[in-house]
Amino acid sequence: MIEDTTGMLEQYTGSLTDSIQKEYLIDEKFYQGDVKRGLRNSDGTGVLVGVTKVGSVQGYFMQDGQRVPAPGKLYYRGIELTEIVEAHRKADTFGFEEVAYLLLMGYLPTRGELNHFNDIMNRARKLPDGFTESMIMRHPSRNIMNELERSILSLYSYDPEPDNIEIDNILMQSVRLIGYFPSIIANAYAVKRHYFDGDSLHIHFPVENLSTAENFLRMMRPDKSYTDEEAKLLDMMLMVHAEHGGGNNSTFVCRALSSSGTDTYSAIAGAVGSLKGPLHGGANAKVMEMFRYVKENVDPHDDGSIKDYLNKMLDREAGDRSGKLYGLGHAVYTMSDPRAVLLKKYARHMAEIKGYAEEFDLLQKVEELGIPLIQERRKSDAPMCANVDMYSGLVYTMLGIPEDVFTPLFASARIAGWCANRIEEVVTCHRIMRPAYRAVTIRGKYVPMEERTVSKAL
């Protein structure tokens, strides 16, 4: 039925495009003054709309009304992320489950509490009976994020109390969703490969007593095999993506929806929709696309060759012609992104094992040479750094994870932070979020049908 109307609709909407664009454009002068476009202050900082105990991001400090750059730090419940990751690397343990507990409960668990939480998570990973067959296999999607979003909304129908927003019920829903996400993603990708790419269908169920990272790799691979080092690296990826403060776009969407009193599934589905955007979670795939252009067109051992090509990309003469170098710069971090620092530190060994050492080195060259080029064009010496997206795509690639799953895997980590922020919003903020928009429309009168002129677009 959709195909039957596509041609007619394309002709109709195509004839109106120019007129519509003209009607929707707003003169830049109206944004001057106190309008916080993009919820940003004039200095680029985010508009303060609330307080949180869940996560915090530090990339600068204010002095005499000016931003002063500082090394980047990311805190989960007041504990520095780097400290958490380093502790688990030293102990050679998996840490994502502990991070999820910390974010949800507000404190680090004892061994007994973590073991109990892991037991609960083991049971929560199994999707409802028939869910994969009825919701994923019957309605395959080329885009795994869309499949994930739809699946979350479908889970509403499997919950006996989906609209109950008492804290114990939201917490129960949160634990289930954290457990469900890897299975939904792995199954959705397997079905996508089968229906759209013509590959064999392999559906693997999660296994108890394995970590989230281990289960994900096991479910994603036809032969279910993985190494401990691969699983530990993926576990670190989950830890560094689990939370990033209440102001990032997807978490803010989750909070805004939660402020309306809506159900958990609607709030989390909205967050997934936000994360899908290329300006948010989809940036890691854009970095890999950019990297392929660079790799195909430069001599990796010649800095001049690399700089020349990066300049062409900035001039919109190469790459995707957007004029951007993806993975460089961040809204908060100035001198360093602690997540990128961790990835560079711990992914190097995997790059050597997997035969990606040259790619890793070239990506570092893009970072080192690209930042000065951007600063030069901006006529600014303000510090810039590579963000986590600069290296996350290559890490996923080294782990054999396809680009279709980059952003969904990001969501599989961030679900812990979304749920914690949702609970905090429900507990502490009893007002619906309601910002204002200033109307700049020219006032007019209703014109009777017989007195109207024919639209210029027609």
Named regions from a protein language model:
Residues 1-458:
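Non-transmembrane, aqueous-exposed alpha-helical and coiled segments at domain scale
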